[in-house]
Amino acid sequence: MRFLSTDMKDRNMLFAAIPSICASSPKKISIYNEEMIVARCFIGFLIFSRKSLGKTFKETLDGRIESIQEELLQFFNPNEVIPEESNEQQRLLRISLRICSTVVESLPTARCAPKCEKTVQALLCRNLNVKSATLLNATSSRRIRLQDDIVTGFHFSVSERFVSGSTFKASTIDLIREGLIVLRKVRVGGSI
């Protein structure tokens, strides 16, 4: 086995650590008890597996990052039904941004000062992004409110059916079926 310079340093560190762990008796005989052997093995393991452990941790973290990104993509479902008004508002914002950029290009000061043009465009883009984020937050809050209303309604209907003295008693299977129908409608984006 070939040792590189870093491997030699690691090996020298291991051999330097062994005497500091070993206890000597008065007769100059090394005493190796179980703790000493475990400590030596652990130090050797750390020194010689440092590179492979680093790669393992990096691969683990990279895998976790990928899974988090996949989970985030699931939240931004392209099949989600977005209200017509939000689509229309986004379209109008894009058009106004294009119009503003053409107006800025036609201004004589924009020809003289390209920095001004970039600043105005950056400001318009930032305003567009803020309005877009506000619109997405409003859409998201509407969806959350709808889900809360569905859950509340389902809880109310279940508790109403199991109240003592109620004349209408539904079986558990019927309740589960109703719940699944409601969930399917919510996932598809249909109305309830």
Curated annotation (Swiss-Prot):
Q: Name one Pfam family in it.
A: Mt_ATP-synt_B
Q: Which UniProt keywords apply?
A: ATP synthesis, CF(0), Hydrogen ion transport, Ion transport, Membrane, Mitochondrion, Transmembrane, Transmembrane helix, Transport
Q: Does the keyword Membrane apply?
A: yes
Cellular component per GO, a single term: proton-transporting ATP synthase complex
TM spans (from-to): 29-49
Q: Which InterPro entries match?
A: ATP_synth_Bsub_B/MI25, MI25_plants
Give the location in the cell.
Answer: Mitochondrion membrane
One GO BP annotation is: proton motive force-driven ATP synthesis
Mostly located where? Answer: mitochondrion
Recorded topology in the membrane: Single-pass membrane protein
- GO molecular function terms attached to this record: proton transmembrane transporter activity
Q: Please explain the role this protein plays, according to its UniProt record.
A: This is one of the chains of the nonenzymatic component (CF(0) subunit) of the mitochondrial ATPase complex.
Q: How does it assemble?
A: F-type ATPases have 2 components, CF(1) - the catalytic core - and CF(0) - the membrane proton channel. CF(1) has five subunits: alpha(3), beta(3), gamma(1), delta(1), epsilon(1). CF(0) has three main subunits: a, b and c.
**What family does the Swiss-Prot or TrEMBL record give for this protein?**
Belongs to the ATPase protein MI25 family.
Question: What is the protein name given in its UniProt record?
Answer: ATP synthase protein MI25
| Taxonomic lineage | Eukaryota, Viridiplantae, Streptophyta, Embryophyta, Tracheophyta
